[in-house]
Amino acid sequence: QVNFSPGWG
């Protein structure tokens, strides 16, 4: 399961 949370940067 892959969850992309806002804040990758």
UniProtKB/Swiss-Prot annotation:
A GO cellular component term found in this entry reads: extracellular region
Q: Give the chief site where it resides.
A: secreted
Q: Do you know which InterPro entries this protein is assigned to?
A: Adipokinetic_hormone_CS (IPR002047)
Respond yes or no to whether keyword Ubl conjugation is given for this record.
Answer: no
The processes (GO biological process) annotated in the record are:
neuropeptide signaling pathway
Instruction: Kindly list the places in or outside the cell where this protein is found, as annotated in its UniProt entry.
Output: Secreted
What are the UniProt keywords, alphabetically?
Answer: Amidation, Hormone, Neuropeptide, Pyrrolidone carboxylic acid, Secreted
| Modified residue annotations for Glycine amide | G9
Highest taxon of source: Eukaryota
Instruction: Indicate the secretion signal residues.
Output: none
Database matches in PROSITE patterns: AKH
Molecular functions per Gene Ontology: hormone activity
Q: Which residues carry this modification: Pyrrolidone carboxylic acid?
A: Q1
Q: Which family does it belong to?
A: Belongs to the AKH/HRTH/RPCH family.
Main function = Hypertrehalosaemic factors are neuropeptides that elevate the level of trehalose in the hemolymph (trehalose is the major carbohydrate in the hemolymph of insects).
Provide the protein name. Hypertrehalosaemic factor
Which lineage?
Eukaryota, Metazoa, Ecdysozoa, Arthropoda, Hexapoda
